[in-house]
Amino acid sequence: MKKLVLLFFFTLISSSIIAQVQDNVTWSTSPNPFNDSEKIKISVSGLDPSKWSTDDVYLWTWFFDSNDVEVSSQINWNGEWNNSKESMKMTKNSDGTFSFEFTPTELFQYEGIGKIGVLAKAKDGTGDKKTPDYFFEVGRFDLTINSPKINPVILEREGSVNISVSSTNEINYYLMNGDQVLFESLNNKTFSKDILGPDSENDGIKLIESITLRLLCKDINDSNNFINLNFDIVVEPSSIEKEPPFELHDGVNYVNGDDSKIYLQLNAPNKDFIYVLGNFNQYIKSNESLMNVNPLNNKFWIEINDLNENENYWYQYEVFSKSPVSGSPTVVKVADPFSNVIISSYDDTNISLDSYPNLPKFPKNQSGEFTLINQLDKYNWNVLNFEKPKKDDLIIYEILVRDFDNERSFQNLIDRIEYFKNLNINAIELMPLMEFEGNESWGYNSSYHLSLDKFYGTQNKLKEFIDLCHENGIAVILDLALNHVFGRSPLVKMWMDDPDNNSWGGPSNENPYFNQSAKHTYSVGYDFNHQNELTQYYTKRVVEHWINEYKIDGFRWDLTKGFTQNCDENNYDCTNSFQQDRVDLLKSYADYSWSLDPDHYVIFEHLGSDNEEKEWANYRIDEGKGIMMWGKMTSLFNQLSMGFSDNSDISRADHKSRGFNDKRLVAYAESHDEERIMYKNLNFGNSSNSNHDVKNLEIALERMKALGSSLLLIPGPKMIWHFSEMGMENSIFTCEDGSYGGEDCKLSTKPQPQWSDDWTLLNKRKEIYEYWSKIIELKINEPVFEGEYELKVFNQNKLLPTIDIWNDNLSGDTLKYVYVISNFDVTKKSLILDLPISGEWKDLVNNEFIDFSQNSSIELEPGTSLVLGNYLDCGSFDSDGDGIGDVCDDDVDGDGILNTDDNCPNTLAGSTVDLNGCEIFTLPLDNNKVSVTSASCIGNTDGSIGLSIEDASYAYSVTVTGKDD
């Protein structure tokens, strides 16, 4: 049914949806039988809408043509699956039935309807609040098509196609080409006629070119009672083998300096011939629209000419297979799998013109999806060479554009740039933007990975947002779901298993891209076989496109456990264990990303075993690379925020605990896929202390500050989910109306209280935002966080974690030590500080200086944290005149021996010393003085040192250079 086409992902992504299908219903229609131009009344009985928590019932309907092929219409009479149109509301009758009256040709705006599909549903059908599909045949007399069983049908050049129809009534049959009658059979229950190919030696109706023949079937007693059957007969073309003028890549190939011409290439193994149908050729199959075959690689290609650079063009492929595998169609119409923009009969009617102005209308009398050739309005980038933030410094802000602001658009993000800047985050991660099925989605149900989904805005609007982020020092990371696709993908449809011929199905056994059954246990959609060269080529083209076209700074690879061929959909142990094939494969994808952009961020959502994850985290780490790994810490940090010691050990937020050689762990407390911290604080928090009840909103919000300190100040990359910085308490299971709906509403669009209630001005929420902003700024700007650290969790009280941070490479009057301690208990705690040095420490959040000994004791209020920093005072003495106070100088006497190794400190200038810093020879003190007067490029071979030497009678000046020549 149509709902499966539009919102198939709802039934796949959420595995625990509670079924609410009402099976025991009965359908009827009046009159029965009926023609498509008659007004009919459809009724359903045995339905109890109270099981769906509603009193109202809506009809959801779709239709098929006279050849029993489902029609994809650009007219949307139903509305959305989660929001049916009021015009489709059924009437509740006194006998308990529900009914709906309509004229099929008027509702569907289509003539020649052969069958109507119906179901009844709640206005929001999410969670299977519906009845099963039911079908009504259209027509006042019965007809059975005996052959051909498929439509269109291929007519081989020397072959024939038999058109055979039968009825229980005597019928007048007229086989017609347009208005011309080619053959008639009167007063018969059956009709049969052979149609011959152009090279056939038999006599009869011979076709030279492809054509649609119409069989008019009339009631012999009522000429107004008739049915038209259409048969699309495609004459097999003569094959054309021809090399293209230059090497093409799959998809659209533009010609430099010639906007009037493009080349298209499609790789379609096991297909026999392909037509390109578009608005540039009026969608007509002809020799001019037939693709050539490149004899060097067997790929299909075509040259398209006479294009106007100021117009939009679109096309789709009509792909033919003379001998498809059992259950697969002879012909499919698909958009280009390498499309950059799609125009769709399924989704486009519900896309706001505010977000996507000048959206081309879907072409009349066409179906499916088309590739838009968009050469208009090229974007001019302001930032050409963005310097990415260091991996160690990343604070990533994860966003679902749909739920960020009311307009659900890229423009919303642009308008909120000051919000991002003031929070001081330096990276934004956008959940998938690739063309996905439906409009309101998380985006993981992708069908075209190179195509931008139009629901959020135009290509240029996304580029404008990325450009603006780069202008403000913010990197943009894109979530990439490349372990699977969904059913509208051309890569599925060209080789699909479609035994009921309804134009939908999973991969057939000849599909070169997909496994028929998933090779891992977390599969949704259809599982890519990434050991296949075609899949690897497709994946690399996706990576190349988003890096080069959109200047994307990094990818978060979704569900990398799915990149293996070694397991099956039922073996969790296999999926979760080390798999060498995916280790090697994903390294190769990382290598390819780095070949395009050496500083590209590669992030894996693997959530697997340490022995596998460290293979990636440590990969090419000596080159400054290494793959960053998602580190889910939700339940552990949530236990802390709720005030419970059990299962609250956050020591795994330390990259060293996982065997990583450097800081490549993206630890997080919240992500798009987890229950919200604040929701659990308010509903399940520790309420044992009435003076500090975590279920109290003010207290729960206050504790979010400590959570920020304990997570974000751990050195290395970190991630936050949007609006956790203001304590968003809506559950992940919140419905669009703000109610709690369980799994049914996990994927639902969320309300926007952060803007409608202006949270940025509310004291407590503003405090969290400003607090997090301070510690994020500290984390990003202070080089101490690029040093070493120890995350300490004490077995006797896990609610008091500490982070000890230092950087021995720092010198001078700078922040060299940071000490973070938190109290997640619900009572005040007296704590012993384990500071590395005694002296003056600074409260880095409140800007207060405090004197501490190394083992000072402090009292920390419940749900709070203290962030201390030690700035070294280098003193006013500078014995060797190098500009570094003696306290901080590694070589105070300037004899070339570090203080730590100098057994003879304060050696006089002019002395020659041994390895222990003790003098071997010194100029006489009474009449000699040697000093360094200048130095340049210290530590390099082309520097110089100027010396001044004085005695009682003479002054000397010597310059010593280190130049190689």
Q: Predicted segment positions?
A:
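Extracellular calcium-associated, cysteine-rich motifs in secreted modular proteins
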Residues: 874-925
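Conserved alpha/beta catalytic core and glycan-binding cleft of carbohydrate-active enzymes
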Residues: 551, 584-729, 733, 780, ...
